[in-house]
Design a protein with these regions (language model features):
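Catalytic domains of carbohydrate-active enzymes, especially glycoside hydrolases
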Residues: 19-31
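Active-site beta->alpha loop and helix N-cap motifs at the rims of alpha/beta catalytic domains
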Residues: 3-19, 36, 40
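Divalent metal-dependent hydrolysis catalytic cores, especially in the metallo-beta-lactamase
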Residues: 1-3, 28
Length: 168
């Protein structure tokens, strides 16, 4: 289980991250995607504050373009920030951009907003546009389509993450 750290000032994000760790969370989902250079600084400050034992996931919220994504993710890799994955770095429809990124970085890329249906999952997996698939029941239309996506991913050896959209 992860907890989301909303994009904010570096100091506020570090404070929110430390608070989450104090409450027992060991996986933080860091929201970024507004300012590339500043995004790297945010992640670096959080990593320094929480230490190496806490998993960091980065959600760019479709906020970067493909080349910018490669530069930012490469910078995080070069700094040894040990990011578990980067979620949806580019616009949902930009599967060429996703593939461009996936081919050029070592950090796993998670498709989220790009996957609404089993057909989307097949296309993303076969094209090499992502390393991982994020499934949200509200987004996929319920448990049955979500299970189909899981089955498809399993056939291709692709891991899935199950998330939510704060539905009630």
């Amino acid at each position: 289980t992860d907890i989301t750290i909303s994009v904010n000032s570096i100091d506020q994000m570090v404070s929110d991250s430390l608070d989450a760790v104090r409450r027992g969370y060991r996986t933080l989902k860091i929201k970024v995607g507004k300012e590339g250079v500043q995004d790297v600084a945010r992640i670096a400050a959080i990593r320094k504050a929480v230490g190496p034992e806490v998993l960091l996931r980065v959600d760019a919220n479709q906020g970067w373009d493909a080349r910018q994504s490669v530069a930012i993710i490469s910078a995080m890799e070069d700094q040894g920030l040990d990011i578990e994955l980067v979620e949806q770095p580019v616009k949902a429809h930009d599967l060429e951009g996703m593939r461009y990124i996936t081919q050029r970085v070592q950090t796993p890329i998670l498709a989220d907003e790009s996957v609404f249906s089993p057909a989307d999952a097949i296309h993303i997996i076969q094209s090499g546009a992502a390393d991982l698939i994020n499934i949200k029941l509200m987004k996929t239309g319920g448990i049955w389509p979500a299970l189909k996506i899981c089955d498809i991913a399993e056939l291709y050896g692709v891991e899935c993450i199950i998330g939510c959209m704060l539905e009630s």
